Every structure is written in C-alpha cells, then in structure tokens.
Regions:
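Structural motif
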Residues: 83-86, 116-119, 139-142, 180-182, ...
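Charged, amphipathic alpha-helical linker segments immediately N-terminal to NTP-binding catalytic cores
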Residues: 125-158
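Short, surface-exposed connector motifs at secondary-structure boundaries
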Residues: 110-116, 135-138
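Short, positively charged and aromatic/hydrophobic N-terminal segments
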Residues: 2-19
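Gly/Thr-rich phosphate-binding loop signature of adenosyl cofactor/nucleotide-binding cores
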Residues: 26-111
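Conserved nucleotide-sensing/catalytic segment adjacent to the nucleotide-binding pocket
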Residues: 207, 214-229
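Glycine-rich phosphate-binding P-loop
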Residues: 179-200, 204-205
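P-loop NTPase nucleotide-binding/switch module
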Residues: 158-178
C-alpha cells in the first residue's frame, strides 16, 4: 500500500500528493493539453457578449489568466496572447478616463493580439469599442457577475486541473477517511481484493485497474479513472 498525504477533496475525485507523478515539475504556463472555452464558460457561468464561432471550437492551452492593465497603459512587451484576458473594475475605470483616441488605440492593440477570450467581471457591459474590435479581430467577448479576484481564482483552478500534466498507472485508487490511497503492484497480487475490503468498510473506490494522475499544482496530484475507460 502506498499511502499519499491528503491535500484536499474535490467531488468524486480522490486527491493524492506524493512523488508518484514525476512529470510536470517544471511545466511552463502553456500546456500540451487543451480545454474548450465552452467548458470554461460553463464552469465559471460566463455569458457571451460576442463570439466569432461556437465556444467549443476554441481551445485554451495557457494555465494562467491575465489582467491587461499595463497593456492598456501602453506597454506591450512580453504580452502572452495565449492567456484569457480579464477586465475588472480598475481597468474599466481607467479606460473611461482616457480620451476616445487613446482608448481606441489601446483596446485595438489588446484585441489585435487575438487572445482566446476577453472577460468582463462584476456584471459590467462591454464598451462599444470592445464590441467593435472583438468582431474585427474575431475575439470572444464574455461576461461574468463574479468579483474579479474570485473569477480569476476559479478559472485558474479549472485550467490547472484540465491542463495538468498526466500519466496513467496500473493500480487501484481508493479514498480512506478522506485520504487518497494508490495501491500498486504486479497483476494478481490482490490490489482489487484489497480495495473491495476497504469498500466493505465504508470507504470509496475511485478507480480500478487504470488510474489517471494529474499534477494540478506542485504539491497536489489529482487521481481519477481515465475518461475513456
């Protein structure tokens, strides 16, 4: 039995943290995996102000989101256009104070980078210029009623889970007293039988035979059954 320290508990998943997953320790902000913008919008309860196509056709690969305050001030260096852009009350207030010409310049620059989406928080409606440049450059423009920090936290959590580096191991994953336990061993040594005995005692079976492990952060590994099994 390999007992893994509990980090947290998310729904039907068992959460484990150990050195079982070696890949992904130095992962960059861009993942080899992707998640559809439609799934992110559903998870975060986002509404659509404009989209050039169905949201499920747009894939997001960056594990972070970005508030483009410094870009709207005219600094464009090192801008990562793979991140979802979040515009909160601070950015909107700043844009309101700019002259029409300067506001158009900075907004056009933002949308010309063609990020996966631009999201307005706190129930704010997009400016007419935002709609204009969203249509011109084909950038989805979404809205949320959440506070900016709350929405960013939710999106980052979802992105870290969906885009996490992952491997599949032969074994059985159970949850015992809230802790994820990964049972490893050769075929026929009794992994499934051990899991059955634990289930009889009121514990939960998470995955049998094949276990998908995702490193959702540097200290957490998420274990679940592979989606295609």
């Amino acid at each position: 039995l390999y007992t893994c320290a509990l980090c947290t508990k998310i729904g039907r998943y068992g959460i484990i943290s150990n050195n079982v997953l070696q890949k992904g320790k130095g992962r960059s902000t861009v993942s080899e995996f992707s998640v559809s913008l439609a799934k992110l919008a559903e998870e975060a309860n986002l509404t659509t102000a404009y989209t050039p196509c169905e949201l499920d056709k747009i894939q997001v690969t960056a594990t972070e989101v970005y508030r483009p305050g410094i870009l709207l001030a005219g600094y464009y260096e090192n801008f990562d256009n793979k991140r979802i852009q979040i515009i909160g009350l601070t950015e909107m207030s700043y844009l309101d104070e700019l002259s029409t010409s300067l506001r158009n310049t900075h907004l056009e620059k933002l949308f010309s980078f063609q990020p996966p989406a631009v999201v307005l928080t706190r129930g704010m409606r997009p400016m007419s210029e935002m709609m204009q440049y969203a249509k011109q450059y084909g950038v989805p423009l979404l809205m949320s009623t959440e506070m900016t920090s709350a929405l960013m936290g939710q999106l980052i959590t979802t992105l870290n889970t969906e885009l996490a580096p992952r491997i599949t191991r032969h074994g059985v994953l159970v949850e015992v007293y809230g802790e994820g336990i990964l049972i490893l061993g050769d075929s026929g040594v009794g992994k499934s039988e051990t899991a059955i005995e634990l289930v009889k005692r009121g514990h939960r079976l998470i995955a049998d035979d094949a276990v998908e492990l995702r490193r959702v952060s540097y200290r957490k590994i998420l274990g679940t059954a592979p989606a295609n099994i």
